[in-house]
């Protein structure tokens, strides 16, 4: 038994796209067969059926309606699959034998441009990577906007990973013979990125001609061969998947990695530049604070500014001056912002023009958008700063395009371009004539209905239309005796009516439908001509769109500066960072207004090269260090900064080593990862770099950790080729002695006040080292039971006493008695005041900005609290036997036992942020106040 012709055709098509799920068009459905069907049915939750295919067993099959395909495609692409779309290439009714079919497009994570899949304020990049000896080249494209960027450098894995982190591509195209170890590294760091491989020859083939044909600014002598190969490989892949040359990709932008501030992968994560650490979402990041853009284009551009801060003084100052001018002209700024709100995503609309997928409604959106450009140009003429003057001179008002769209298209056209109702009256004589014929025909139909009602006496008679029978006269069965004989021709019988036609009705039907069909055809042809004209002018619209996005970014920075009382930083060439009353831009937004404690900073490459910060956990050391880095980044993107005064030197790189980061899946411990990160910093930092090191050495034994931290400080300060500006937080108080021995080391600490055996964090960074870590006091604040705290103090006294004798002699404690647990329970609830005053601010200060993600000490305190609560509840009965009821009433007598104790039992505190934990505790406390 042989394969059926259709199945033979399917397998031939499938052979050309083995790495894709094939959507095979059969009538009104896309069908999937064999393994593709099994995968799709699982991922899309479709029923898996079977189809006779000429083999002994039925072929597994599932399908989806073609008109709903985008929803299903988006789900598969989001899961990392590629989809090959196989369409019917001829009219089935006109074909003899099997319908001709072929792949019209391959959809991949990096090339899918459906609006439902794309994030409005984020690019959808696809990247290519080419390696040759010790050099590598990378190209990044967003086919929805037309951006195409390329760069190259000496090959270092860290450099490649940094660029991937910066652009966050959905897909990476590699040469098929590249080392698997490198691919493994990429997948390990970026598990959600799809990897695609192409042959070596696709990077080389017809390279100069391809690039000249695609890019109107390409000069083959300006680019290294390796860069051209990377770009050519990416263009090949785009053409291979889209089956078309995209006219919106018309310019290649080469950038040098060293032209922008380098922020490595770990630093982007630790500083929460564009997403928070915990949920990987925008909220709680620097981007979240700075993004007040009014257009999708501006939102994407601001993200790029933040991902790639500048390192050249002039462009930084140009942006700062423009922001300052906006702040000095609030009325003009508000007018600008109001018009920006009316501008749609010009870049992605013209991207749809290039791919021939734009509809008439989207062109109306384009018309409305470019209609605002003359007003924006007029506003720009009122500014004096260099950046705005240049924008005013360069912006194209696109009035010819606006005029055409306004004259040609209806204000509310059909969604489908193949259903007519697109072209405005007066634009084309033939369209107007056919519309009149169609309208007159329908008037004739209406008059016919009235005439037949009068002649037959059937008041319920109707003249109707459907696509199967055309126009017909419908008469209910109750009135069939009134139907005139000979003139009505029966067409269809229904359960409660009969349908008839007449010769004159069929004659008019042909005229009406002929006019309608012709009208739709002419309107579509006119629409394609309009679309082609716009496509010829894509470059003009893209340039205007970029200027609009820059204006939107500057307005956003001005808005944020005004709302948050930011100041204009001075950019210096002294290799010095001087900040007066600096504030963390994110943390100050998530705590009550006015409660953030500002701090000064002075870091240079001479006397204040390494700022050694000591003090207890939860006191704010990490927040302070991140604050300095974020203020520096803000200054280098051209933003005002949260401070009273800021004098910022341009940094070439920012490195951070903050927080614990086990990589257990890769078999790496906290300490191993920590040392790898420190090694990377010491190898790549320069004298112009800013380095943040937090608790170096804490992942190993005390003396090993102290020795490593000491040695790292010496290396940074004594290595003449390094001497980078450094903030170094530590709990090793022995390191404070280095100020007297190493030039450039300066001791600072977090101010702490002791009141009646309690500590209060003052959040101020002051000159001089801390004399103790207050570890036990922090543990007490975190809610550890009194017996544990008291025992810890005893052990500490023994250890400190035994240090001089070079021995450690501690007698094990007796087993805790029930009364100890009573005290522990009291302490747990009595931490209310401490938790209210400390957790709220301490965890915000010491954790990763607004994500409120607990650090190691906070996790321990939360874990301890959970154990105390469980212990208190489980031992309730035994406690009651040993103590008077009154002595235990403080914990539970004021609580409605069943509801509130159950609520406490079910608290999953380890999966709460500290702020959520505080709010839950506060809620429980309030409930107890309502109980008599």
Curated annotation (Swiss-Prot):
Keyword DNA damage: yes
Keywords: ATP-binding, DNA damage, DNA repair, DNA-binding, Nucleotide-binding
CDD domains linked to this entry: ABC_MutS1
Cited Pfam families: MutS_I (PF01624), MutS_II (PF05188), MutS_III (PF05192), MutS_IV (PF05190), MutS_V (PF00488)
Domain of life: Bacteria
GO molecular function per UniProt: ATP binding; ATP-dependent DNA damage sensor activity; damaged DNA binding; mismatched DNA binding
InterPro entries: DNA_mismatch_repair_MutS, DNA_mismatch_repair_MutS-lik_N, DNA_mismatch_repair_MutS/MSH, DNA_mismatch_repair_MutS_C, DNA_mismatch_repair_MutS_clamp, DNA_mismatch_repair_MutS_core, DNA_mismatch_repair_MutS_N, DNA_mismatch_repair_MutS_sf
GO cellular component, one term: cytosol
Sequence positions that bind ATP: 615-622
Signal peptide (residue range): none
Listed GO biological process terms: mismatch repair
SMART domains from the UniProt entry: MUTSac, MUTSd
Family named by the database record: Belongs to the DNA mismatch repair MutS family.
Known function: This protein is involved in the repair of mismatches in DNA. It is possible that it carries out the mismatch recognition step. This protein has a weak ATPase activity.
UniProt xrefs under PANTHER family: DNA MISMATCH REPAIR PROTEIN MSH1, MITOCHONDRIAL (PTHR11361:SF34), DNA MISMATCH REPAIR PROTEIN MUTS FAMILY MEMBER (PTHR11361)
NCBIfam families according to UniProt: mutS1, PRK05399.1
Protein's UniProt name: DNA mismatch repair protein MutS
Organism: Clostridium botulinum (strain Okra / Type B1)
Annotated gene: mutS
């Amino acid at each position: 038994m042989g394969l059926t012709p259709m199945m033979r055709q399917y397998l031939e098509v499938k052979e050309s796209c083995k790495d894709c799920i094939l959507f095979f068009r059969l009538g009104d459905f896309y069908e999937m067969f064999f393994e593709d069907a099994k995968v799709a049915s699982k991922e899309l939750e479709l029923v898996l059926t079977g189809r006779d295919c000429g083999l002994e067993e039925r072929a597994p099959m599932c399908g989806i309606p073609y008109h709903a395909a985008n929803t299903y495609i988006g789900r598969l692409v989001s899961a990392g699959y590629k989809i090959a779309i196989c369409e019917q290439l001829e009219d089935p009714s006109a074909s003899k034998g099997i319908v001709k079919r072929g792949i019209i497009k391959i959809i991949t994570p990096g090339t899918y441009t459906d609006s439902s899949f794309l994030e409005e304020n984020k690019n959808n990049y696809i990247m290519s990577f080419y390696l040759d000896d010790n050099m590598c080249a990378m190209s990044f494209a967003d086919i929805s906007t037309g951006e195409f960027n390329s760069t190259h450098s000496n090959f270092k894995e860290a450099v490649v990973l940094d660029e991937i982190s910066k652009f966050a591509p959905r897909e990476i195209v590699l040469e098929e013979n590249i080392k698997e170890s490198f691919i493994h590294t990429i997948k390990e760091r970026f598990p959600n990125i799809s990897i695609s491989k192409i042959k070596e020859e696709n990077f080389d083939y017809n390279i100069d001609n391809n690039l000249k044909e695609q890019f109107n600014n390409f000069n083959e002598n300006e680019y290294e061969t390796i860069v051209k190969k990377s770009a050519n490989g990416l263009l090949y892949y785009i053409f291979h998947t889209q089956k078309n040359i995209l006219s919106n990709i018309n310019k290649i932008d080469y950038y040098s990695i060293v032209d922008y501030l380098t922020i490595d992968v770990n630093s982007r994560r630790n500083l929460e530049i564009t997403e928070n650490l915990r949920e990987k979402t925008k909220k709680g990041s620097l981007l979240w604070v700075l993004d007040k853009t009014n257009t999708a284009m501006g939102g994407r551009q601001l993200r790029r500014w933040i991902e790639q801060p500048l390192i050249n003084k002039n462009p930084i100052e140009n942006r700062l001056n423009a922001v300052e001018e906006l702040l000095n002209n609030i009325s003009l700024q508000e007018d600008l912002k109001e018009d920006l709100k009316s501008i749609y995503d010009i870049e992605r609309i013209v991207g749809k023009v290039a791919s021939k997928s734009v509809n008439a409604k989207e062109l109306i959106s384009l018309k409305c958008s470019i209609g605002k450009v003359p007003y924006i140009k007029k506003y720009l003429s009122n500014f004096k700063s260099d950046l705005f003057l240049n924008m005013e001179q360069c912006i194209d008002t696109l009035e010819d395009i606006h005029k055409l769209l306004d004259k040609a298209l209806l204000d509310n056209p059909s969604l489908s371009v193949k259903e007519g109702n697109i072209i405005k009256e007066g634009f084309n004589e033939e369209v107007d004539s056919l519309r009149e014929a169609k309208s007159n025909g329908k008037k004739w139909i209406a008059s016919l209905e009235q005439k037949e009602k009068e002649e037959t006496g059937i008041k319920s008679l109707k003249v109707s239309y459907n696509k199967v029978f055309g126009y017909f006269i419908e008469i209910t069965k109750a009135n069939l005796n009134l139907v005139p004989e000979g003139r009505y021709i029966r067409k269809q019988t229904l359960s409660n009516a009969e349908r008839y036609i007449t010769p004159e009705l069929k004659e008019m039907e042909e005229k009406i439908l002929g006019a309608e069909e012709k009208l739709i055809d002419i309107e579509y042809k006119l629409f394609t001509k309009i679309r082609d004209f716009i496509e010829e002018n894509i470059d003009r619209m893209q340039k205007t769109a970029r200027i609009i996005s820059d204006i939107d970014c500057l307005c956003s920075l001005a808005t944020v500066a005004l709302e948050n009382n930011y100041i204009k930083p001075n950019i210096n060439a002294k290799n010095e960072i001087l900040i007066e009353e600096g504030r963390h831009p994110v943390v100050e937004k998530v705590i009550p207004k006015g409660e953030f404690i500002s701090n000064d900073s002075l870091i240079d490459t001479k006397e204040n090269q390494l700022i050694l910060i000591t003090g207890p956990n939860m006191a704010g050391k990490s927040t302070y260090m991140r604050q300095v880095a974020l203020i520096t980044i803000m200054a280098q993107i051209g933003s005002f900064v949260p401070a009273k005064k800021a004098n910022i030197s341009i940094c070439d790189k920012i490195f951070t080593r903050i927080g614990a980061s086990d990589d257990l899946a890769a078999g790496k411990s906290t300490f191993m990862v920590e040392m790898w990160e420190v090694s990377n910093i010491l190898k790549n930092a320069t004298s112009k770099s800013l380095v943040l090191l937090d608790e170096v050495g804490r992942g190993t034994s005390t003396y090993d950790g102290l020795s490593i931290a000491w040695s790292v400080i010496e290396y940074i300060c004594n290595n003449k080729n390094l001497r980078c500006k450094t903030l170094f937080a530590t709990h090793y108080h022995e390191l404070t002695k280095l100020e007297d021995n190493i030039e450039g080391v300066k001791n600072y600490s977090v101010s702490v006040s002791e009141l009646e055996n309690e500590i209060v964090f003052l959040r101020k960074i002051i000159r001089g080292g801390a004399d103790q870590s207050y570890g036990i006091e922090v543990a007490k604040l975190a809610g550890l039971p009194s017996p544990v705290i008291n025992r810890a103090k005893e052990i500490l006294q023994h250890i400190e006493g035994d240090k001089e004798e070079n021995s450690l002699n501690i007698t094990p404690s007796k087993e805790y008695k029930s009364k100890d647990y009573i005290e522990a329970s009291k302490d747990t609830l009595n931490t209310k005041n401490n938790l209210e005053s400390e957790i709220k601010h301490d965890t915000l200060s010491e954790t990763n900005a607004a994500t409120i993600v607990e650090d190691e000490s906070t996790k321990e305190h939360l874990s301890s609290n959970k154990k105390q609560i469980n212990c208190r509840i489980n031992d309730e009965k035994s406690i009651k036997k040993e103590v008077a009821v009154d002595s235990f009433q403080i914990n539970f007598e004021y609580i409605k036992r069943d509801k509130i104790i159950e609520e406490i039992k079910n608290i999953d505190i380890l999966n709460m942020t500290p702020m959520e934990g505080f709010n839950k505790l506060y809620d429980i406390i309030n409930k107890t106040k309502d109980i008599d």
